[in-house]
Amino acid sequence: DPLWSRGLGDVYKRQDEGRVIDAGDTPVQFDLQARSGQRWRVGLSVCYDLRFPELYRAHARAGADLLLVPSAFTHTTGQAHWEVLLRARAVENLAYVLAPAQGGVHANGRHTWGHSMLVDPWGSILAQRDQGAGVVAGELDVQRLSAVRAQLPALTHRVL
């Protein structure tokens, strides 16, 4: 469930998820075991949740290594904010971010941004798909995650 679910007026025009989806009240994580046996703690979010950094900090506090952000940003907001928000969430929470994103012009005329992306905890884009059907794939490296967290231990220095 998205933690935020209200009408967005002119931003999404005819879209009002709040009519059909109830907002959640608790961040959700789960453990995913890779074929290698490595366990990854995954923090869940949906689309507009990306604009609320406190959700991702809650995931980080719960030990998230990977933040999952499936989305359908509009073309306008996606072009302006998508990449910078994803990279910021990765850096400020020292976690990988995987963001599958719907893109293209839809039957109702809605134009979504696309640009599915995998970002590492340093904020580097590891893989990206601009528009159209396709797959974004990349490797999650636990050694890279540990190295970045050791190099920049900001989560242990936080004020609040």
Language-model segments: which ranges?
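Short, well-ordered beta-strand micro-motif
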Residues: 29-31, 118, 137-139
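A signal for specific C-terminal beta-sheet/loop modules enriched in small/flexible residues
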Residues: 14-16, 138-143
